[in-house]
A protein has these predicted regions:
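A generic structural motif
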Residues: 22-26, 67-68, 122
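Short glycine-aspartate micro-motif
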Residues: 5-8, 69-73, 174
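Glycine-rich anion/phosphate-binding loops
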Residues: 48-54, 101-109
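Phosphate-binding/catalytic loop of phosphoryl-transfer enzymes
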Residues: 106-110, 114-174
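Short beta-strand-loop/turn "lid" adjacent to the catalytic site in phosphate-handling enzymes
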Residues: 59, 64-105, 131-146
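Conserved active-site "lid/cap" helical segment
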Residues: 32-73
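Short glycine-rich, Thr/Ser-proximal phosphate-binding strand/loop in the N-terminal lobe
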Residues: 5-46
């Protein structure tokens, strides 16, 4: 039965995964990657197959099959600036992550998510990546005419906490 969501959060020294069934976590694991494990890879995106294999091993040991998934949600990467929201991972995004302007492990989320999703004909998404840019024009000012502030931070965390607080206060975040 397709009733699970796989969450992927690749970081510089680990890949965190969670599997949810409805709102309940049924598996949570942090796969550690030592410096020695990652040393053979010249570029972050070269780690894709290595991390993919680790994720598949964890899912197998947990008895979770890819064909039980309804979708995958992965940590978003260093794309061009975009508004906040949920985005389906597509070939254009994959190409941008394979040829990034900046390398970071978060770029692997979309790559791994799309690979796994394609294996079982489901969709993969990213949500509020670090490149979300919703700054107002005046917030870009730095005091130097030739220097503009660039928006880049952990939007997903900020918005998740803000939505929780808003719920507690009986308000909406948006």
């Amino acid at each position: 039965m397709k009733d699970k969501v796989l969450i992927l959060n690749p970081g510089s020294t680990s890949t965190k995964i969670a599997v949810y069934c409805n709102d309940e976590i049924i598996h949570l694991e942090s796969i550690q990657h030592s410096h020695e494990d990652l040393a053979p890879f010249a570029h972050v995106q070269d780690q894709k197959e290595y991390r993919l294999e680790k994720i598949l091993n964890v899912l197998d040991k947990a008895g979770i099959k890819l064909d039980e998934l309804i979708c995958i949600s992965a940590r978003g990467g260093l794309l061009h600036p975009i508004p906040g929201g949920t985005y389906e991972v597509n070939d254009i995004m994959v190409d941008e992550m394979m040829h990034p302007k900046k390398e970071h492990a978060c770029n692997l989320g979309a790559l791994i998510g799309k690979d796994l999703a394609d294996r079982v004909s489901i969709k993969s998404y990213i949500v509020d990546p670090v490149v979300v840019d919703e700054l107002w024009p005046w917030a870009r000012m730095t005091g130097l005419k030739e220097v503009k502030r660039v928006c880049q931070f952990h939007v997903l965390n900020q918005k998740a906490i803000a939505r929780k607080v808003a719920r507690v206060l009986g308000k909406t975040y948006e």
